[in-house]
Amino acid sequence: MMKVCVIEGDGIGKEVIPEAIKILNELGEFEIIKGEAGLECLKKYGNALPEDTIEKAKEADIILFGAITSPKPGEVKNYKSPIITLRKMFHLYANVRPINNFGIGQLIGKIADYEFLNAKNIDIVIIRENTEDLYVGRERLENDTAIAERVITRKGSERIIRFAFEYAIKNNRKKVSCIHKANVLRITDGLFLEVFNEIKKHYNIEADDYLVDSTAMNLIKHPEKFDVIVTTNMFGDILSDEASALIGGLGLAPSANIGDDKALFEPVHGSAPDIAGKGIANPMASILSIAMLFDYIGEKEKGDLIREAVKYCLINKKVTPDLGGDLKTKDVGDEILNYIRKKLKGY
């Protein structure tokens, strides 16, 4: 039996992850082991990622992560983000973030009251390098100057770019686009683009590249230009949040953090302390992350069933307030669960 280490974290992480676990347990048999992490954990134990949680994560085959609240800058000395620590610790170098409106973009635009959404059907996958870039956390103060090191390695670039091409081919995608700022960041992004241009020659699939600033505009104006995007850590973080607006917001944005030996699944959204405890957080991103989990373990039909259930809820406006509905977090989880149960019974 596969072991899943569940780390709910802070805020709405504690509300959406239980809904995801309901779906996980309905569709498979897993041993659930729970760990703690985040700001509450820091206040309780003096450590945002206790050793006990690390050991449980090591023991598990898969990690399911909620969301964490970070302390304010300067509030905690030498603070290290638990999620970034886990990504580095387990070499989870590929962050896969699907941006998909299930072919019902116009409907989502109406129910979510996003006026700029139209009938365009969005199906983009952003693949973000997950262990390098500015997120290595090498920052320092020299007198009155703050300095951050941006680390881009050939090994890290090759690894994520090959992953993107392999992902595209395996999933019958049509194109891989490299997003960079090599015209200014000539050494760091220059290396990333150089590696992309070397590797693309070995794959029989369309490949191109765009500057990150023009990409930010074209994601909104011409999202149909993009299929699979591969990019560096910070650009991927920013662009995927921006792109989520095309599909109704972060409440519909799942993600997978994949390494050679382990994977971690999490919603893209944060802990949302402004709505925590109100029971109105959208659990769909967490539940869609479970769909990605089933894809990862080779049970794509279960992942597809989850996505079908989410689409059903969107079409029938069985959604939380962020998407224009009036259901509670638990209600949406129950609606998705009931749809899955009916389908499994042949209804």
Curated annotation (Swiss-Prot):
Source organism phylogeny: Archaea, Methanobacteriati, Methanobacteriota, Methanomada group, Methanococci
The catalytic activity of this protein is classed by the Enzyme Commission as: 1.1.1.87, 1.1.1.-
Does the record bear Metal-binding in its keywords? yes
Activity relative to temperature: Stable at 100 degrees Celsius for 10 min.
Give residues where Phosphoserine occurs: S81
- Sequence positions that bind Mg(2+): D213, D237, D241
Recorded GO molecular functions are: 3-isopropylmalate dehydrogenase activity; homoisocitrate dehydrogenase activity; isocitrate dehydrogenase (NAD+) activity; magnesium ion binding; NAD binding
Name of the protein in its database record = Homoisocitrate dehydrogenase
Q: Which InterPro entries match?
A: HICDH (IPR054960), IsoCit/isopropylmalate_DH_CS (IPR019818), IsoPropMal-DH-like_dom (IPR024084), LEU3_arc (IPR011828)
Task: Name the positions where (2R,3S)-homoisocitrate binds.
Answer: S70, R87, R97, R128, Y135, K181, N183
Which organism does this sequence originate in?
Methanocaldococcus jannaschii (strain ATCC 43067 / DSM 2661 / JAL-1 / JCM 10045 / NBRC 100440)
